[in-house]
């Protein structure tokens, strides 16, 4: 409890405060290790996550989580390669898609927008989009996609929690960790805790201001 924590040694306090973030960090790194071990680094197709009801893909029987590997026998290894290939196509053109369901003939629909947006509109695909990464497990594209997403988001979420929890701001553990560490040298003055929070807020504010100024320059 809190009383035992306050009476513990500085080393014990630091271990307790670092435990949560350390576990989250290790879990995130484990997910990243599995991600890099189980999946190829280069994408090999485009995953259809959403289709427009009544659109060309929907009419052809292509469903959510299907993978497009090639168009007219030309490999497309990413959503952008798929969009680039269809850049020269026109509404009404027939295209043969090599998919995880087999070869499927699709008649392109009406085009709207420019670039990639034009390609998606002709296919009848809706965002979001993602590249397909082949798994070394060989258990099918649908399983590969869900396993990839699970590991990817596990890495992202656990790493974010670990970093956020170690921010030197109240009420995160990082604030108490830094306070406990500095208190060993500066005593138990309350001003130390306030100074840590003020300094951290200044860093965050400076980062936000610099980001805003950079965006103004880019505009």
Label for each model-derived stretch:
Residues 1-219:
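Hydrophobic transmembrane alpha-helices and their immediate loop junctions
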């Amino acid at each position: 409890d809190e009383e035992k924590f306050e009476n513990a040694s500085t080393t014990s306090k630091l271990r307790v405060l670092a435990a949560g973030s350390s576990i989250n960090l290790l879990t995130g790194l484990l997910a990243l290790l599995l991600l890099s071990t189980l999946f190829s680094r280069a994408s090999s197709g485009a995953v259809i996550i959403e289709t427009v009801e009544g659109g060309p893909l929907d009419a052809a029987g292509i469903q959510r989580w299907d993978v497009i590997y090639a168009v007219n026998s030309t490999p497309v290894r990413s959503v952008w390669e798929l969009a680039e290939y269809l850049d020269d196509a026109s509404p009404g053109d027939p295209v043969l898609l090599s998919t995880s369901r087999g070869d499927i003939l699709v008649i392109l629909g009406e085009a709207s927008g420019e670039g990639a947006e034009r390609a998606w509109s002709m296919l009848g695909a809706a965002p979001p989009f993602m590249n397909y990464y082949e798994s070394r497990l060989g258990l099918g594209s649908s399983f590969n996609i869900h396993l990839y997403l699970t590991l990817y988001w596990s890495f992202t979420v656990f790493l974010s929690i670990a970093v956020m929890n170690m921010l030197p701001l109240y009420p995160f553990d990082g604030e108490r960790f830094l306070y406990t560490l500095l208190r060993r040298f500066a005593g138990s003055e309350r001003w130390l805790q306030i100074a840590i929070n003020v300094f951290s807020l200044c860093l965050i504010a400076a980062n936000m201001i610099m980001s805003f100024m950079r965006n103004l320059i880019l505009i």
